[in-house]
């Protein structure tokens, strides 16, 4: 009986895969995410994961936002602040990664 083998590989590209703004999140959602009293939450996923550190730096320099979560292994970044600040930070971070590092970009989405 032959065994079937599956090999999974992580092949990092240079990509912003998600840039989403949650305006006026409900209290329960904000609490579960760990950013109570946030006017808005920005969520990004990036490849390679280490890009989250660069994205966090760009976001903090772009607007008056705070980092709620950053994981350099999974490439996740959560920022929070006012709606205008989070929107500006996400926009500047996405465009900065494209301009400075030639990343493949996604459209910023909102809810």
Curated annotation (Swiss-Prot):
Gene3D superfamilies: 3.30.70.1710. Changing residue 39 to V: Crystallizes as a symmetric hexamer, migrates more slowly in native gels. Residues 5-103 form the BMC circularly permuted domain. GO terms for biological process: ethanolamine catabolic process; protein hexamerization. The keyword Magnesium does not apply. GO terms for molecular function: identical protein binding; structural molecule activity. InterPro entries: BMC_CP, BMC_dom, CcmK-like_sf, EutS/PduU/CutR. It holds the Pfam family BMC. Keywords: Bacterial microcompartment. It is found in: Bacterial microcompartment. The keyword Cell membrane does not apply. One of its GO terms (cellular component) is ethanolamine degradation polyhedral organelle. Pathway: Amine and polyamine degradation; ethanolamine degradation. Belongs to the EutS/PduU family. Homohexamer with a central pore; the hexamer is not symmetric, it is bent by about 40 degrees; bending depends on Gly-39. Interacts with the N-terminus of EutC and of EutE, targeting them to the interior of the BMC. One side of the hexamer is concave and lined by hydrophobic residues, the other side has a slightly protruding, 6-stranded beta-barrel. A component of the bacterial microcompartment (BMC) shell dedicated to ethanolamine degradation. Its unusual hexameric shape may help form the BMC shell. Targets at least 2 proteins (EutC and EutE) to the interior of the BMC. Proteins such as EutS containing circularly permuted BMC domains may play a key role in conferring heterogeneity and flexibility in this BMC. This is Bacterial microcompartment shell protein EutS. It comes from Escherichia coli (strain K12).
